Amino acid sequence: MSGPFWLEKQALLMLHSESLAEHGGLCGLRDEGLLDSALARPQNLKAYAPDADMAALAAAYGVGLARNHPFADGNKRAAFLAVGLFLALNGWRLVATPVEATQIMLGVASGELEEDAFAAWIRDHVRER
């Protein structure tokens, strides 16, 4: 494999819109630069740490989106969806209950859970597809 399949901005924007339609929240992108920054985090990680595994790269997406707050609403949901989509694109399936997902993303967004700890949590919650 030449490298991971990265998330496209348009795919994440669609996921975010669908999430808002299903769960509610304010529509809109608050800061496109913050979105671009969050989407670039895993690629930068891979460039500087070539041995970073899929969980570390997925965690970089999750942390970047949850903490950058690029959307008007639904940032934690978008972050978790991005983690799941990235893993799925690369042959993995994230397995977590809604309660687990909520708790982990609250910890990520607040800064209580560091990126390495989030990556470890992801490793414990993925299965090969």
Where are these predicted regions, by residue range?
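FIC/Doc superfamily catalytic core
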Residues: M1-R129
